[in-house]
Amino acid sequence: KELVRWKYQRYIKDYLRCIASVDDNVGRMLDYLKETGLTKNTVVIYCSDQGFYLGEHGWFDKRWIYEESLRTPFLVHWPSVTKPGTVNNDIVSPIDFASTFLEVAGAKVPNDIQGRSLVPLLKGNTPKDWRTTFYYHYYEFPGWHDVRRHYGVTDGRYKLIRFYEPDVNEWELYDLKTDPHEMQSVYGRSQYASIQAGLKKELNRQRR
């Protein structure tokens, strides 16, 4: 009971305090840039390494492939390049950051670096060959958090997941348009057969 109380009270309260502190201090930094006249010559990028559960699905923390954890904050303020209030729905990844920072700074991007620069996307010119799926794999089990090993792939509209522990062999498929909170798996339903087969093919490709 004490652990449960800590997880759902102290831990989440600490997390929310952290968010409030970050918000306050990002604001202070933006105010400083404005006051010193540096705003027009500074690119501000805010991101995180993962999302977080605040009770969704009955969970806290991260790790699972569901949307609340899989999606991460990524905000960019680049005067004369990004338009305030615009949203880009392309699939990006932290592996793209290094290439992006190098290009923004005017440095050469090595040919063998992982990821691709996000600069074209920030300018509103998404390359035709930009990725259309995202692969995720969680393998840290057993552990105190008791999150089972699983992997999956999403194209932004649909998400296919497989839990593969020796005592678990389960698949889940979600239609994120009709079920954005991922409450009802549609895996095995005939109307999703082609979607399911296509995502399995893509999952196998990504895992090679």
Regions found by a protein language model. Give the residues of each.
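Long, internal low-complexity/basic segments
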Residues: 1-10, 18, 22, 93, ...
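A long, amphipathic alpha-helix that forms part
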Residues: 2-42
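Beta-strand elements within well-structured catalytic alpha/beta cores of enzymes
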Residues: 15, 19-22, 26, 43-48, ...
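Short, solvent-exposed loop/helix junctions and linker helices
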Residues: 16, 69, 88-91, 95, ...
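Histidine-centered active-site microenvironments of extracellular/periplasmic hydrolases
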Residues: 31-86, 93, 144
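Generic structural signal for alpha-helix termini and adjacent loop/cap motifs
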Residues: 32, 36, 104-107, 124, ...
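C-terminal cap/loop subdomain of S1 sulfatases and analogous C-terminal strand-loop tails that border
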Residues: 50-56, 95-98, 103-176, 181, ...
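Short, polar/flexible loop-turn hinges at active-site or ligand-entry regions and domain interfaces
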Residues: 82-87, 107-109, 190
